[in-house]
Amino acid sequence: MYKAETRGIMVTVEPRFVEEESSPGESRYFFAYTVEIVNNGSEQVQLRSRHWRIIDGRGACQEVRGAGVVGKQPVLEPGESFSYTSGCPLTTPDGLMAGSYTMSTIGGESFEAEIPAFSLDSPHLRRVVH
């Protein structure tokens, strides 16, 4: 489990390899990740957008930006949380993801809440030791 906190917004990510959606012989590796966002702060916030950096095992980086998460822009009162699960296909058996959520306060102030960097590791990864 990976965690980061920014201005009272705790983001926890738990990734997993999804064998049934993967086809290693065709260089297709699918990963799911569950995110929990907890408002440990003292004011209401709303998740407005997301920004992901996805880096595969060869070092190729893809950036993804979009409004909200899974079609929602949740509002979190102090003490509330929101969880969702999404997925990421890669052409390599490993990689990593990191990013941020743009949050806004009830007063209209925006800030970036860090999504912790987390590794995507499949059992098909062959490690070479010299």
Swiss-Prot record:
InterPro entries: ApaG_domain (IPR007474), ApaG_sf (IPR036767), Uncharacterised_ApaG (IPR023065). Residues 3-127 form the ApaG domain. Gene3D superfamilies: ApaG domain. GO terms for biological process: error-free translesion synthesis. It comes from the Bacteria. This is Protein ApaG. It comes from Methylorubrum extorquens (strain PA1).
